[in-house]
Amino acid sequence: YDSQSEITKYNNETNLLGDKIYRKGMKMGEIWGYVTDRFYTEDDFNADGTLKPGIPIPKGAGKVFPGDVLYKNFDDDTETIWSGEGTADNPGDQRIIGNSTPRFHYGITAGISWKGLDLSIFLRGVGKRDYWRTDQIAWPTGGWGSLFKETLNFWTPTNTNAYYPRVYSNDGVNTSYN
């Protein structure tokens, strides 16, 4: 059976979004965020390094470079990626990108007995759950750490079809977005 819960009544007239903020019509465990479109490419920039018209930049992100993540722009503002008013009525460019509620729980139990020896096993799991990774699994290179082999497929000028965005020093640039 599908484990989902929806809030049918809650006093939040402003429809604010956020962690532990509830609203009518919300499915428990909603994950709001930006939807990846692609990486910025060198073609998105003018010769002086500024973005060409119509290429959006995340609000407050500072300067972006080729290889940074470009998010989809869903609202009428074509120059900025932003969180709107932070409400369900005006989420800006954020969308529901997942749900952290474990769904489709299952379990299997088996046992066998032979000449006084008993063996039993119990397996259980979840068939669907989205996970918002914000720890060392997501950011394994914190501090002076080294890269895992799996993370070496990052964007460079010679590897523009990479899986991961460009790497850069931990100087606080784009930390809210990339």
Residues covered by each model-derived region:
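Outer-membrane beta-barrel pore domains and translocons
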Residues: 1-2, 113, 124-126
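Conserved small-residue
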Residues: 1-98, 138-141, 149-177
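Short Gly/aromatic-enriched secondary-structure transition segments
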Residues: 10-11, 124-127, 132-139
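Residues that define the transmembrane beta-barrel architecture of outer-membrane proteins
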Residues: 102-106, 178
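Domain-core and long-helix interface of multi-subunit machines
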Residues: 106, 147-148
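Outer-membrane beta-barrel architecture
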Residues: 109-111
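Repeated loop/turn-to-beta-strand initiation elements of outer-membrane beta-barrel proteins
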Residues: 116-120
